[in-house]
Amino acid sequence: MAEDVSSAAPSPRGCADGRDADPTEEQMAETERNDEEQFECQELLECQVQVGAPEEEEEEEEDAGLVAEAEAVAAGWMLDFLCLSLCRAFRDGRSEDFRRTRNSAEAIIHGLSSLTACQLRTIYICQFLTRIAAGKTLDAQFENDERITPLESALMIWGSIEKEHDKLHEEIQNLIKIQAIAVCMENGNFKEAEEVFERIFGDPNSHMPFKSKLLMIISQKDTFHSFFQHFSYNHMMEKIKSYVNYVLSEKSSTFLMKAAAKVVESKRTRTITSQDKPSGNDVEMETEANLDTRKSVSDKQSAVTESSEGTVSLLRSHKNLFLSKLQHGTQQQDLNKKERRVGTPQSTKKKKESRRATESRIPVSKSQPVTPEKHRARKRQAWLWEEDKNLRSGVRKYGEGNWSKILLHYKFNNRTSVMLKDRWRTMKKLKLISSDSED
């Protein structure tokens, strides 16, 4: 091959002499060495490219793995924070905040691929409160079995939240069982009440102290039995709120809350004038807060690392049992639009209140908070003589404290159960409850 190349091209020396010269053996050997060196250099370059590519891919894979782990840690922090916010909204009765926080928690949960035991318990708490908030909406569906009512579903989850069955746990469990039947009877669904009773107390070996009592009440179709007055829905809610307060004290030390609290404290300790640069100050304050909480981050990451061995795969049921079937709107009991909707905190309100709350939000300016506007509108509504009359009649018939039943069976001007309670207290102070002659 070298010989063919040499013979085909004129040598430099031949050109200089004005004639072609035959290549010597030394020149031929040198040409072969040059060709070999060039070939080896090309091979070496190709090898370097091939060797360098896997290293870059490995680095990219390591970076991607680090990002994924960091996202999982951050998602865990957000889940704790949203559970904390959900508990506060539930306890304070802020239904709109409850709904928004619930939807945010749903998005976080659907993005998780695995769970620690602590995160799983957090999800159970969110699921439990969501079902309790929809407790009186019998057509709300949380289970694959459409017959299961919201309170039945809450009862099943409640058993998974707390391993130690203390007195509060037992009280809440019994109250949910009773109200799961009472809610059906209040809606006139006595057949469904029997079915709920069978599902809850179907075990023939179970010996519940109030099992026979409930069976007798169902058979008599006594919706307003004194037993239901003693173990009322409001009593159940108060007990659940006691548990929520426990969760709040437990989760108030979560990382995001601690970091946010440090930022707020840092801002409060500074005197910021309108001439200061807000962006620079904010960055500086947040940087200081981050420095203060660096140890908290390290501790949190250590906790995540230690608990990584105890992670469990996020089963489909953990996602679906939360909110996947709760996407049909927020106004379940609208008088003009009776539509099927699943699980919002407003489901325990009556139709009139739900419609009024929706309409009252429309004209509110964006610069004004919605909640104070609602309260101001409600305070301006004077109580009519007819409303006082209906309130006295309702208390006389159903008893003091059963405001939801009174609201359901008597006509009021866009009132809530809380309004009835406050008005009744005012009437007692003014000694207006004895004026029954007009009734």
UniProtKB/Swiss-Prot annotation:
Gene3D superfamilies noted in UniProt: Homeodomain-like, Telomere repeat-binding factor, dimerisation domain
GO molecular function, one term: identical protein binding
Signal peptide: none
Key words, A-Z: Acetylation, ADP-ribosylation, Cell cycle, Cell division, Chromosome, Cytoplasm, Cytoskeleton, DNA-binding, Isopeptide bond, Mitosis, Nucleus, Phosphoprotein, Telomere, Ubl conjugation
Annotated region described as Disordered, given as residue ranges: 1-36, 266-311, 326-375
One Pfam family in the UniProt entry: Myb_DNA-binding
Effect the entry attributes to changing S219 to D/E: Fails to induce apoptosis and decreases radiation hypersensitivity of ataxia-telangiectasia cells (phospho-mimicking mutants)
PROSITE patterns in the cross-refs: HTH_MYB
Domain HTH myb-type stretches: 375-432
Effect seen on changing A75P: Abolishes dimerization and telomere binding
Induction remark: Expression is tightly regulated during the cell cycle; levels are low in G1 and S phase and increase during G2 phase and mitosis.
Keyword Cell division in annotation: yes
UniProt region (TRFH mediates dimerization), positions on chain: 58-268
Residues found modified as N-acetylalanine: A2
Family annotation (PANTHER family): TELOMERIC REPEAT-BINDING FACTOR 1, TELOMERIC REPEAT-BINDING FACTOR 1 TERF1
Function description: Binds the telomeric double-stranded 5'-TTAGGG-3' repeat and negatively regulates telomere length. Involved in the regulation of the mitotic spindle. Component of the shelterin complex (telosome) that is involved in the regulation of telomere length and protection. Shelterin associates with arrays of double-stranded 5'-TTAGGG-3' repeats added by telomerase and protects chromosome ends; without its protective activity, telomeres are no longer hidden from the DNA damage surveillance and chromosome ends are inappropriately processed by DNA repair pathways.
Name of this protein: Telomeric repeat-binding factor 1
Organism: Homo sapiens
